[in-house]
């Protein structure tokens, strides 16, 4: 009797009695109890047992120091009254369940506890960030095998210092238009493979795009190979000719469009500049200014370069010019 009762004791009684009550009309009378206390599992047993007659929507005060999120969700489903979890210092469970129980107003007493995730598959990066926003405690994600989401979402989650245990899992990016510099950031966060199969367009500076293809060649990134992106868009106003050559050598027959419309300046050796300005895949090139890096240069090759662009050619690095007087 009374307004509060131990669910631990009631659950123990239920277990002791076993199936005996299945043939009896009498039940354990807990109808006068307004608050049940005990572990989450024992409270759940009390609230769901057919042998216990309890009042509708009792209050619950849990005693767990580590509470299982999935069990807490089941307890919450049995009562609309207060569920107090103030004693818990750790919440464990799958990320989606943990995120649910940490939501403001779902239960009381949470918000500063540590979190231990038990997922062994993929977890959405947005869920990791959401969990971090709902507790000030540390979040152990060492069991997670894959982090998935947009590059922005993934990089945000990796950047949260309170999330530990990440660094060797796979990543699956969902961007259809993928920023190469953001891909580089993701690649730097994990030793696992970053899958970009969803991407149809890769864009960024020439150096960032070239680095993305290098990462693919090194098997740190997957999805930029034979069945990779359809379009490569080189952004920015200045590019090293060597990076553009790297991109040209990396794109496959499946890439239907290589764009560099924003480029106004090329840098690099004369031979690299001639090579890329002669490349038909870069249809937007031909009017850029070129700053060559050679110190020794044949005049004939300089003339060839000059014929490849309508822009000015700067040869201030050249200290020795060779060739015929006519050149």
Model-derived regions, located:
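General marker for long, soluble alpha-helical cores
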Residues: 1-327
